Amino acid sequence: TAASKDDSYLPNTNEVVPLIHLNPGVFEVSGIRGYSDSWKNIGIWLTKLMEGRDQLLPEDVNSLKALTAQYPTPREKAKAVYELLRNTTRYVNISLGIGGLRPEKASDVKARGFGDCKALSNYMCAMLKALDIPCDYAVISTEHKNVLHDFASLGQFNHAIMRVTLPGDTIWLECTDPTLPFGYIHDGIAGHEALIVDGENSHIVRLPMPKHETQKREYKYYVEFTTDGCGYSHIEENYSENYFEKNRTLKEITRQETQDNIREKTGLSTALVVDFKYVENLSNQNVCSYIYTIFAPKFCKQSEKRMYIPTNLFKTDISKYTDYQ
């Protein structure tokens, strides 16, 4: 049969076609035996595999305590440590030996300044544990939201993150992207199920989804036009939550890229960028704004004595956001 066409609203292929899943009931890696008859036992095996790898040198623990001494609450301390992680490490994929399953030692990540998702998440956990802040290492899939609850297998995960559990507050941390704000649950894991790796207490949990009312894409623009159809437009694009995540790259683009982007979105092929700036507000909710002024020689269409003024400059941009509706 012919391959199905890509459609934003279709369910994942694995959910609609027949599949056969195979997995060993008993396995052994690096001398550690595991059982795949339950997610709890998978978590127990991962806990044993990671045993002793979340230790830091005494001098590093003392440095952490000195760094966070000024912050009165565990949340503020955790945020300061997350900033430290962002500023002193970088993501490098390491899959040698059993590196695809077991993270590097936290002390090695501290010394080298890099690691993969497992290593960076484990390192972050190690730093928080050194400050007596409760946290857990977790594995998750960035491709599938749901795990097979009656078929436990490590192959269902491809990523590692971590969870901070405070009284009345649960914080999920992505440790591989230094641009993401503290506690931001990005689109690759939002609403996905994860395995909390905590020995006998290992279990499946689901990460929260952003609230619909906080996901906004807003355009504001003020236009001045002349009798010959030329127009100046001051435009403000505001994005929050998933839209914020998708549009953060706007802060890195050049004037020429900005001009090309605006021409594509508005359909104004002759638009020229007069000025532009990118602004972020991460204090209360994750919001970014892109503010610019354009000049378009053919802003309005003319026909004899009539002038046709576009009332929605961004109508051509709607289809790009179907996955976020």
Regions found by a protein language model. Name each.
Residues 1-325:
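A sensor for short, sequence-defined functional sites
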